Amino acid sequence: MASRKEGTGSTATSSSSTGGAVGKGKGKGGSGDSAVKQVQIDGLVVLKIIKHYQEEGQGTEVVQGVLLGLVVEDRLEITNCFPFPQHTEDDADFDEVQYQMEMMRSLRHVNIDHLHVGWYQSTYYGSFVTRALLDSQFSYQHAIEESVVLIYDPIKTAQGSLSLKAYRLTPKLMEVCKEKDFSPEALKKANITFEHMFEEVPIVIKNSHLINVLMWELEKKSAVADKHELLSLASSNHLGKNLQLLMDRVDEMSQDIIKYNTYMRNSSKQQQQKHQYQQRRQQENMQRQSRGEPPLPEEDLSKLFKPHQAPARMDSLLIAGQINTYCQNIKEFTAQNLGKLFMAQALQEYSN
C-alpha cells in the first residue's frame, strides 16, 4: 500500500457518531493496535456519496461504490470515490471487476489517487448488519488489510445530521471467517459475540481553507430564526419504522432460537439413547462371558447414531447485532426529541 506525506493548506473537522452493533476498535486479538485508527475523508467524497444516493437510491435499494485513497501511518485518507452502476439481471455481460479496473486506470491517467482502500454503501433505517456486508468486507479486508466500509444513512442525514460511519471487521471475526467454521463450538472458542464483530473507526472530514471560509460566511448570513428549526421534533414515522424493523428482527431471532433449542433437545436425546445402548451391550457381553461365549463384535456407533448437524450461529449473531443497532437508533431518536422539548420549554419560559 503506497503512502504520501500529509498535505498542507487545509483543515479537518471531526464527524463523531455512535455505533450500533459495533464496538471501538481494539486491534489484533482485541487488545493490540489496529491497522487503521482514523479515517480522513475529503469533503468532495462525502458530497459524491450523497449525490450518488440522491440520483440512484430508491426506497430500500442501496447504492454502493469504491473508495480510493492512501494510507499515511495509522490513518486512512479517502480522497476520491466512484459508484457501482445500477444494473439488472438482464445485464448479463456486465463485468464489475473489469469496470473497476477501467475506472482506476482512467483516474491514474489524470493523476488522481487510484489505490483501492475500501467501499461504501447506503443503508435503509440502519439495516446494514447483514451476511452480504460481512462477506464483502471480509473479501476487501483479506485482500487489503486497511480496507474500511463507509455506511451512509440518508434518512438520518435528511433530518439535519450527517450520518456517515466507518467500520472494519475485528481480528477475531477475521480469523473465524478464514476458518469458515461458524458452529456454536467454534464461535464459543473464539469468544465472538455480536459486540465483537465490527469495530468503528473515527471519521474526520477534511476541507480546504477556502471551503471553510465559505461555510463561515454562510453561517454568518443565516438568520437567527432559521436556527430555531433545529428545535422541530422529528417525524414519528422514523420511530415507528425502527420499531417495526426491530420487531421483525426479534421474530427472526425467536425462530432461530427455536431451531437451536430443537437441535439441543435432539442431540441430548440421541446421547441418552447412545448411552443406554452402550449399557445394554455391556450387560449382554457380561452375560455372554459368564456363559463362556465370545463377546459381541464391536460396532461403529457413529453409523448407528449419526450426529445431528449443528446450525450455523453466524446469522444469529448478525440478527443480534442488527437488533442492537435498531435499539441504539431508537435511543438516539428519543433522546434528541426529549432534549428539544426541554430546550423549547426553556426558551418559552425565557421569552415570557
From Swiss-Prot:
Cross-link (Glycyl lysine isopeptide (Lys-Gly) (interchain with G-Cter in SUMO2)): 303
PROSITE patterns associated with the record: MPN
MPN domain location: 39-173
GO cellular component terms given for this protein: eukaryotic 43S preinitiation complex; eukaryotic 48S preinitiation complex; eukaryotic translation initiation factor 3 complex; eukaryotic translation initiation factor 3 complex, eIF3m
Keyword terms of this UniProt record: Cytoplasm, Initiation factor, Isopeptide bond, Phosphoprotein, Protein biosynthesis, Ubl conjugation
Record-linked Pfam families: eIF3h_C, JAB
Compositional bias segments (type: Gly residues): 20-32
Annotated family: Belongs to the eIF-3 subunit H family.
PANTHER family: EUKARYOTIC TRANSLATION INITIATION FACTOR 3 -RELATED
Subunit description: Component of the eukaryotic translation initiation factor 3 (eIF-3) complex, which is composed of 13 subunits: EIF3A, EIF3B, EIF3C, EIF3D, EIF3E, EIF3F, EIF3G, EIF3H, EIF3I, EIF3J, EIF3K, EIF3L and EIF3M. The eIF-3 complex appears to include 3 stable modules: module A is composed of EIF3A, EIF3B, EIF3G and EIF3I; module B is composed of EIF3F, EIF3H, and EIF3M; and module C is composed of EIF3C, EIF3D, EIF3E, EIF3K and EIF3L. EIF3C of module C binds EIF3B of module A and EIF3H of module B, thereby linking the three modules. EIF3J is a labile subunit that binds to the eIF-3 complex via EIF3B.
Protein name: Eukaryotic translation initiation factor 3 subunit H
Species assigned in the record: Rattus norvegicus (Rat)
